[in-house]
Amino acid sequence: MTTETRSLFSQLPAIDRLLRDSAFLTLRETYGHTRVVDLLRQMVDEAREMIRATQALPAWCDNWACEADARLQKEAQSALRPVINLTGTVLHTNLGRALQAEEAVAAVSQAMRSPVTLEYDLDGAGRGHRDRALAELLCRITGAEDACIVNNNAAAVLLMLAATASGKEVVVSRGELVEIGGAFRIPDVMRQAGCALHEVGTTNRTHAKDYRQAVNENTALLMKVHTSNYSIEGFTKAVDEAELVSIGKELDIPVVTDLGSGSLVDLSQYGLPKEPMPQELIAAGVSLVSFSGDKLLGGPQAGIIVGKKEMIARLQSHPLKRALRADKMTLAALEATLRLYLHPEALSEKLPTLRLLTRQQEKIQVQGQRLLAPLLAHYGEEFAVAVMPCQSQIGSGSLPVDRLPSAALTFTPHDGRGSRLETLAARWRELPVPVIGRIYDGRLWLDLRCLEDETRFLEMLLK
């Protein structure tokens, strides 16, 4: 060991001495004695390794408490951190999809803080059913005879098939064999449910006769799958649910539909593209309809199945139902969200998903102009900052080809170097509340459609 190395080692403080410092007393109170001691040992080891490798002390050796505090704060951050979503995708799967209404947040908080009547019947003072209250709401909204709730729509499809068609064939149009994120494929789900897939038609055209010709003594279901995350256009033909129900009645075969995203209101009244609604399919005679809770419905992650009472009873009694059931927090949030649909006049204000989807481009443009001056003053030396029109998307596989006119704050490096955009985006991701945008066409875009808290946004970006 050289004299210089020995001298550097001698400058490393004893852990006991550091722990007596007032700053470390505060850290010990906040994070616990054991964790602080473990971290200091780790930091001393790191310093020793650096001395051996570089004959130098780490820069943070001038202020051990500050470095320890920074590390402990970062370590204590939740894995599920709040972010400001300015990607232009309203229902962003990677960012948690639908924001919950205040009523849903309050309901979840109450369910977490107190025992609740999850499976308790107050009238009979005995065991109740966890789906009952929500089933009544869903029947009221959709016109269905009964309903069943599980933890997501993939689970809903799995349960629907396993409980009604295991060991038998399910007839589906080839153009509806969808794959969603995470390689969830309808044919794979059918195999897991114990069903045999019977494809009919072609990718772009399926006729009523294709379904009729496919039915045999082993057919359990005729199935429709709404292609909510892609669109087939041009020379196309499909059989709608009403016609398929007519075929099913003729052949005594139930019809089921997986709607995917699923909307409980006619979106066209808000100037949005119309999506098929569960209540329309129930009215057409479909036996079971499944859809998501956390997409266009605007609630928590859940799989919802509505339909005929005898079919729902088969789902409720299947062993998979217990494995896939929703917990009390999900049910509390979903009930509160569904109750908002009983007051449709206030829905576009109270339901965050609908509120964000229906924001007008003109208002978003005004918001951008309001935010422009402080951002230009802060970033103007390196970037040209402007407000530009852009196109938002709904996301989560909903209405994939439709776009929503919006406005964005854009940042373009004066020197044209794309690396500056990557650096800026990375810096924003490291903020206490990360700001997430998107880079394309030589600019960093912050689509303002989902920005409601301007104060927090400016507080982050002007740091």
UniProtKB/Swiss-Prot annotation:
UniProt-listed Enzyme Commission number(s): 2.9.1.1
Pathway listed: Aminoacyl-tRNA biosynthesis; selenocysteinyl-tRNA(Sec) biosynthesis; selenocysteinyl-tRNA(Sec) from L-seryl-tRNA(Sec) (bacterial route): step 1/1
InterPro entries, sorted: PyrdxlP-dep_Trfase, PyrdxlP-dep_Trfase_major, SelA-like, SelA_trans, SelA_trans_N_dom
GO MF annotation, one: L-seryl-tRNA(Sec) selenium transferase activity
GO biological process, one term: conversion of seryl-tRNAsec to selenocys-tRNAsec
Residues modified as N6-(pyridoxal phosphate)lysine: 295
Coiled coil: none
Origin superkingdom: Bacteria
GO CC annotation terms, alphabetical: cytoplasm
Cofactor(s) it depends on: pyridoxal 5'-phosphate
Protein localization: Cytoplasm
Catalysed reactions listed for this entry: L-seryl-tRNA(Sec) + selenophosphate + H(+) = L-selenocysteinyl-tRNA(Sec) + phosphate
Keyword set, alphabetical order: Cytoplasm, Protein biosynthesis, Pyridoxal phosphate, Selenium, Transferase
Described purpose of this protein according to its UniProt entry: Converts seryl-tRNA(Sec) to selenocysteinyl-tRNA(Sec) required for selenoprotein biosynthesis.
Subunit structure: Homodecamer; pentamer of dimers. Binds only one seryl-tRNA(Sec) per dimer.
PANTHER family assigned to the protein according to its UniProt record, in alphabetical order: L-SERYL-TRNA(SEC) SELENIUM TRANSFERASE
Protein family membership: Belongs to the SelA family.
Name of this chain's protein: L-seryl-tRNA(Sec) selenium transferase
Species for this entry: Escherichia fergusonii (strain ATCC 35469 / DSM 13698 / CCUG 18766 / IAM 14443 / JCM 21226 / LMG 7866 / NBRC 102419 / NCTC 12128 / CDC 0568-73)
Gene that encodes the chain: selA
